Amino acid sequence: YHACYLGDLVIHSLYPQWEPKFGINGGILPEDVEKLLKDYPKTQAVLITSPTYDGAVSDVKRIAEICHAHGISLIVDEAHGAHLGFCPYFPESALKLGADVVIQSFHKTLPSFTQTAVLHVSKSARVDEDRIRRFLGIYQSSSPSYIFMAAMDRCVEFLKNEGKERFEAFAARLEDFYAFIRGLERIRIPGYEIRGDYGIFDFDRSKILLVPDAHGGEWLAEELRKKDHLELEMAAGGYGLALTSVMDTEEGFERLRKALNRIDGELADEEAACVGRVGAGVESALDRRSRSVGYDGVVHNEIVVSLRGAYDGEKETVPLKESEGRISGEFLYLYPPGIPLLMPGERISRDVLGRVAFFQGEGLSIQGLRDYRAEFIDVLKKGR
């Protein structure tokens, strides 16, 4: 989004599919990419995220073929996939599937310091590598951290010398964990079975999605934090996300297994206690979300003004609850992962406001707005 602002780029959005069973975003359909490129033939590049924060992997190979057939490049945000390609247990890296440029964050899934990342350029990339170098020189610091660079070198050496053995052990621990969770009754954890639908071409099982039959992600995160001293990567409306890596130990997996076993039993007891009560029942966060105002899958926002035009335009502040129909002058998102529910230049819909109300009701923090309480939002003075 910073690049779109700086370059005053025209954005055409590609939306992922919606996986309703577990309440997550799926992948990008190749046919949606094809349609977008036909509708907007002046498109210069396509950017997708794969894998997603939740582990959904799009059909990168087919999407790359479509982009190349139209004479443009494919850029893949593979920030949460730096570990891909080192073991057949995990999906293949986008770089080997035809993507022209791939960005990976070492620190997210490999042993390296925060802020260490790499930009890969394919040998057959349809990009000007010299221009990439030039702009990296403009935007990167002229005083890089030697600690960070040394950490990245150490990470590469680790992968060369110990990678095969470590990743095989990691895959075995994950396989044991997924075998264990088949015995849980009140916590659902998706695996390979979600492949093939909703744009999910493949699935990265190092991302463990925990979907309780009752309560929501914030409740689950609090349970694990207070009673088991385990911290989830993210608490979403209907699920929690546990990220694992090649550095996780058997002891860590065992602690998670014991904690989930305890919670699963408590949820079963809670459900049993409700049986027989008039009008009683345990409603899951997914059920609550499905009946929330305007909540039905992925939100499709209307882009009215360019990102730069909205950022720099004259604005006024209005109550968020009364902003339907106005053009946003701010980002609005949940963090993590920081994917916008709304960005500057988009029209504020009832759908978005319904989601915000649901997330706030689940105890999740809305971020991005100048008003940190998320009660007011800056909108363009002109334009409805």
Give the positions of each predicted feature:
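Conserved PLP-enzyme active-site core in the AAT-like
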Residues: 1-193, 212
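Intrinsic, low-complexity polybasic segments
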Residues: 277-281
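Terminal helix/beta-alpha structural elements that buttress the NAD(P)+-binding lobe
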Residues: 369-383
